[in-house]
From Swiss-Prot:
GO term, biological process aspect, one: L-leucine biosynthetic process
The organism of origin for this protein: Polaromonas sp. (strain JS666 / ATCC BAA-500)
Gene3D superfamilies: Aconitase, domain 3
Single GO MF annotation: 4 iron, 4 sulfur cluster binding
Assembly and binders: Heterodimer of LeuC and LeuD.
Name recorded for this polypeptide: 3-isopropylmalate dehydratase large subunit
Cofactor note: Binds 1 [4Fe-4S] cluster per subunit.
Length: 473
């Protein structure tokens, strides 16, 4: 019987399997950042251990890094805990080593799930882990990638392996052509709206279909990034020529004979025609409209043409209660049109949407509208995902488009995605955000987050409220 892409990568990396199904899985690439690594390095130090395979480690600082004040160097990190975590990472990498380290203030520094692919650290067929739940991003390359906890970070450092049980296979097929103005972000929000945040629990998702194949690698990364919001630890896309073209020539990519051998192997990284999936979900891309989350979970999402739901129309008591709680927190009334929702702040960035295509997408809308950020918007910020993305955007003049319209053009980092740094919402503020989570307090205590695409966020910044971006493309 044929195997799925997930089956193939899993089988290639299993070292041993116990009778209860627990397997020892070999890990090829370990991405490290400043938040979940200090305890792991300290554990190694206390046990007198070294990192088992230094060449597997690629590290950067991202969660705590400020997006302003870089001219002050480390003195620009005003929060003492943030500063300690960043300097501790510097010291730990100096002591234990890494294949590549992109520290704070360096040219290649950025969000770990942006710098991994752009440096060639993420390759097809790899097992990739990181102490961060959005490690699923790297599945866009036909890699088995997922987040791990801090104790597991230490375990991988010490043994280059991980204890895991194999998940079931879920195929999500998106066929057809997206309407103009709709993007990868709209696809994945629509998927989560359909399957819910628990729909992928216990599964590894393979995203497939003509709409997925039509996406660029950056679009595929956006989709895989939010596999975790759909309940799955990992999401994958089969390798094709786009994958190979993206990887070729990257800093850590193989070269010469090794490249030729790798490409030959990568060509096998797709599900066999007779592979069996445990579950299949299908979506029609032509029916996907620009998406906006209205509540406090990514599954609370509707199209821009819809209205805030009425809990009284929900028969299920648990769901009705969840809607009522979300409406209270979000300060919304049932029946309000989503395109009438005014915003206080706009955030374009995060590991979901901070790559060069996202910057171009947002800048194109701003340029097309030819207007300034609306007066009711207190702050509209654009945060590139890495130093290289920032550099490329500036070469293309995208920063000038944003700044001329009243946006703030920031330094790279996780920024307002999670309010672990200086960028955050104040209580009651409403934000159009290109990030991946809209939980209560995610962007700041009492902050209200609406997840959208970069184009939708840019249009909201200029109009002061959500609008249907299809009007402008």
């Amino acid at each position: 019987m044929g195997r799925t892409l997930y089956d193939k990568i899993w089988d290639e990396h299993v070292v041993h399997t116990e009778e209860d199904g627990t397997s020892i899985l070999y890990i090829d690439r370990h991405l490290v950042h400043e938040v979940t690594s200090p305890q792991a390095f300290e554990g190694l130090r206390e046990a007198g251990r070294k990192v088992w395979r230094i060449s597997s480690i690629v590290a950067t600082a991202d969660h705590n890094t400020p997006t302003t004040g870089w001219e002050l160097g480390y003195d620009g990190i005003t929060d003492l805990v943030s500063k300690e975590q960043i300097t501790t990472l510097d010291a730990n990498i100096k002591e234990f080593g890494a294949a590549a380290f992109f520290p704070f203030l360096s040219k290649r520094q950025g969000i770990v799930h942006v710098i991994g692919p752009e440096s060639g650290a993420t390759l097809p067929g790899m097992t990739v882990v990181c102490g961060d739940s959005h490690t699923s991003t790297h599945g866009a390359f036909g890699a088995l990638a997922h987040g791990i906890g801090t104790s597991e970070v230490e375990h991988v450092m010490a043994t280059q392996t991980l204890l895991a049980k194999k998940a079931k296979n879920l195929l999500i097929k998106v066929e057809g052509t997206l309407p103009k103005g709709c993007t990868a972000k709209d696809i994945v929000l629509a998927i989560i709206g359909k399957i819910g945040t628990a729909g992928g629990t216990g599964y590894t998702i393979e995203f497939a279909g003509s709409a997925i194949r039509a996406l660029s690698m950056e679009g595929r990364m956006t989709v895989c990034n939010m596999a975790i919001e759909g309940g799955a630890r990992a999401g994958l896309v089969a390798v094709d020529q786009k994958t190979i073209d993206y990887v070729k020539g990257r800093l850590l990519a193989p070269t010469g004979v090794e490249w030729d051998q790798a490409v030959q192997y990568w060509a096998t990284l797709h599900s066999d025609a007779d592979a069996k999936f445990d579950a299949v979900v299908e979506l029609d891309a032509s029916q996907i409209l620009p998406q906006v989350t209205w509540g406090t979970s990514p599954e609370m999402v509707l199209s821009i043409e819809d209205r805030v739901p009425d809990p009284d129309k929900e028969k299920d008591a648990n769901k009705r209660g969840a809607i009522e709680r979300a409406l209270t927190y979000m300060g919304l009334q049932p029946g309000k049109a989503l395109n009438d929702l005014y915003v206080d702040k706009v955030f374009i960035g995060s590991c979901t949407n901070s790559r060069i295509e996202d910057m171009r997408e947002a800048a194109a809308i701003v340029k097309k509208l030819g207007q300034k950020v609306a007066k009711n918007v207190k702050l509209a910020m654009v945060v590139p995902g890495s130093g290289l993305v920032k550099e490329q955007a500036e070469r293309e003049g995208l920063d000038k488009i944003f700044v001329a319209a009243g946006f703030e053009w920031r330094e790279p980092g996780c920024s307002m995605c999670l309010a672990m740094n200086a960028d955050r919402l104040e209580p009651g503020e409403r934000c159009a955000s290109t990030s991946n989570r809209n939980f209560e307090g995610r962007q700041g205590a009492g902050g209200r987050t609406h997840l959208v695409s970069p184009a939708m966020a840019a249009a909201a910044a200029v109009h002061g409220h959500f609008v249907d971006v299809r009007k402008f493309v």
